[in-house]
Amino acid sequence: MSTETELQVAVKTSAKKDSRKKGQDRSEATLIKRFKGEGVRYKAKLIGIDEVSAARGDKLCQDSMMKLKGVVAGARSKGEHKQKIFLTISFGGIKIFDEKTGALQHHHAVHEISYIAKDITDHRAFGYVCGKEGNHRFVAIKTAQAAEPVILDLRDLFQLIYELKQREELEKKAQKDKQCEQAVYQTILEEDVEDPVYQYIVFEAGHEPIRDPETEENIYQVPTSQKKEGVYDVPKSQPVSNGYSFEDFEERFAAATPNRNLPTDFDEIFEATKAVTQLELFGDMSTPPDITSPPTPATPGDAFIPSSSQTLPASADVFSSVPFGTAAVPSGYVAMGAVLPSFWGQQPLVQQQMVMGAQPPVAQVMPGAQPIAWGQPGLFPATQQPWPTVAGQFPPAAFMPTQTVMPLPAAMFQGPLTPLATVPGTSDSTRSSPQTDKPRQKMGKETFKDFQMAQPPPVPSRKPDQPSLTCTSEAFSSYFNKVGVAQDTDDCDDFDISQLNLTPVTSTTPSTNSPPTPAPRQSSPSKSSASHASDPTTDDIFEEGFESPSKSEEQEAPDGSQASSNSDPFGEPSGEPSGDNISPQAGS
């Protein structure tokens, strides 16, 4: 008997522990399962229902509870007992059923219950306030056991419903926001489907963009799956327009010059290419039309592609392929090279070099020889002598009078950067023969038949007997009356005839866009006579054009007198220099 009693006590103890464990498990999933369907069922007795004035209040509930208990005590004296019920707690609320009949007596939804109160005098009694605004009632119930589990279940039910409602509202709000975002994105896609910036916003960075694959350059390019450096790509430049890429040019350049320093060469090529492309900005500054030189390239990349008529060996210099080759230039002509764009900004520095005797690099080309690159010393380097007059004294407007009829082109007044083509000198017998004078006179007449000289600027004179000239119709005749007359060395005469680089068909179109450049003489006292004697045709043409009938007598004179007469821009008609007109070179 004792063993059976011990077994029964052990079973009851384990059942209580299980119920406690079940009561302690109050997770969300467990509570949902607990209150789902019919919910939790409790046995109880209905104390009564009382109307109250407020929806909540502890004192209010206590007063209502004492009032209902007094009513029950009066009924008990009459032999009436409390009604036995069972109540269920679920998501539907609190339902009160009659224990005998099982009929539903009262049903209060969760949202109708506003307050729950526990009786402080009886641990088995509790009550709650339910109803709508203006119709609140207090329901008092006495449970068969302690009322605390029922109160805890009601609290858990309210908390669970509140959390579920809150989560549902958040989900609805998130879904609404998502729908709004989708609507906005849909509007963007419909209106700005071609804009790659909006495409990058809508799609991820690694996705393929919606754009035309034909277009190679876009200001904004969405990165593809293979290229993820950034959203915006810099437009790619295409310097070569004739089918040759920059890689092809680099390979050709490396093959042609294997022993040169590539970074330095590329800088030099870039500067030379700018000089080639800048020629079109300053008017007609290219070579004369009769010289068959390649045209100026349209793009920088075309300058380094050799043409069919100009093939040079691989050992040639870097700039031999640039269209400055003088292989097609006839002997006896002075080649007019391209003026670098940086020369215009360095005019004061060049004038300083002219006065101080500095020697700018001049490329001299011999007949049949390879062209020499810019910046290298010439085959016959010549020192520079100080120019007796100050170059660039008059503004550019002084060379353009009001009535200008086909003046000399400004490109003919080349500065110190003009390369000179030296030709072999002729013998004394050839120069003094009358057979050579006739072709020269004919050539001089044909040369100057198309020229109309412009009126020169006013030349200030220091002599008191000569008045200041003005740009009138008499200035032209007064200017040429000075030919053969000794002038002061300080007179500024920019129309130095010996510096004019002329060809038989030189264009006479005025180059008004190119600024005036100083043209200092680039020969030493020892070299000047040789340089003038090596090119007698040019000097004879000019002097015979200005009424010098006895050139044969000048050519028969010794070399010293010839150097003195040639150094004077406007020689004496008889070929005999005056005392005032002797050049500093001859004097020294």
Swiss-Prot record:
Residues 503-512, 520-534 have a biased composition (Low complexity). GO terms for molecular function: signaling adaptor activity. Transmembrane segments: none annotated. Residues 1-26, 417-443, 451-470, 502-588 are annotated as: Disordered. GO terms for biological process: adult walking behavior; astrocyte differentiation; axonogenesis; cell surface receptor signaling pathway via JAK-STAT; cell-cell adhesion involved in neuronal-glial interactions involved in cerebral cortex radial glia guided migration; central nervous system neuron differentiation; cerebellum structural organization; dendrite development. PROSITE patterns: PID. Residues 424-436 have a biased composition (Polar residues). Mainly expressed in brain. Keywords: Cytoplasm, Developmental protein, Differentiation, Neurodegeneration, Neurogenesis, Phosphoprotein, Spinocerebellar ataxia, Ubl conjugation. GO terms for cellular component: cytoplasm; cytosol; glutamatergic synapse; intracellular membrane-bounded organelle; perinuclear region of cytoplasm. Coiled coil: none annotated. The modification Phosphoserine is found at residue 524. Residues 15-26 have a biased composition (Basic and acidic residues). Residues 537-546 have a biased composition (Acidic residues). Pfam families: DAB2_SBM, PID. Phosphorylated by FYN on Tyr-198 and Tyr-220 upon reelin induction in embryonic neurons. Also phosphorylated on Ser-524 independently of reelin signaling. Ubiquitinated by various cullin-5-RING E3 ubiquitin-protein ligase complexes (ECS complexes) following ligand-binding and phosphorylation, leading to its degradation. Ubiquitinated by the ECS(SOCS7) complex in the cortical plate of the developing cerebral cortex following ligand-binding and phosphorylation by FYN, leading to its degradation by the proteasome. Recognized by ZSWIM8 through a disorder targets misorder mechanism that eliminates misfolded DAB1 via ubiquitination and proteasomal degradation. The PID domain specifically binds to the Asn-Pro-Xaa-Tyr(P) motif found in many tyrosine-phosphorylated proteins. It is linked to Spinocerebellar ataxia 37: A form of spinocerebellar ataxia, a clinically and genetically heterogeneous group of cerebellar disorders. Patients show progressive incoordination of gait and often poor coordination of hands, speech and eye movements, due to degeneration of the cerebellum with variable involvement of the brainstem and spinal cord. SCA37 is an autosomal dominant form characterized by adult-onset of slowly progressive gait instability, frequent falls, and dysarthria associated with cerebellar atrophy on brain imaging. Associates with the SH2 domains of SRC, FYN and ABL. Interacts (phosphorylated on tyrosine residues) with CRK and CRKL (via respective SH2 domain). Interacts with SIAH1, LRP8 and VLDLR. Interacts with LRP1. Interacts with APLP1 (via NPXY motif). Interacts with DAB2IP. Interacts with ZSWIM8. This is Disabled homolog 1. The gene is DAB1.
